[in-house]
Swiss-Prot record:
It comes from the Bacteria. Na(+) binds at G75, T78. The lineage of its organism: Bacteria, Pseudomonadati, Myxococcota, Myxococcia, Myxococcales. This is Fluoride-specific ion channel FluC. Na(+) is not transported, but it plays an essential structural role and its presence is essential for fluoride channel function. GO terms for biological process: cellular detoxification of fluoride.
Amino acid sequence: MARLLLVCLGGALGSGARYLTSAWALRAFGPDFPRGTLLVNVSGSFLLAGIMTASLQSEAFPPDLRLFLAAGVMGGFTTYSSFNYETLALLEQGRLAAAAGYLLATVLGCLAAAVAATLLVRWLAG
């Protein structure tokens, strides 16, 4: 039960952070392209890869902290379902190039962010 509460609390924090990040991006860039979700998913991929790499490299990283951060906070922060819906919305608006760009930017950006975080954490760990 304690682990479930850790995930739920982390999820609440991550969801709040996603809302604030997306709201900021909407104010900063406008509604013409889903920059907020792209920012959330790419930065979330970076953070999740960093968390997982650090937790697997160090015995001092408590499993409950990994659960709270990875499944909870990052699970609440990132949003695959919004990414899919927004891609579909762009397609339905006839914005094929924007949909393709969003799809590629998300998939490649998230992968690049995960690789960068993994390499950074390994480098910092020595």
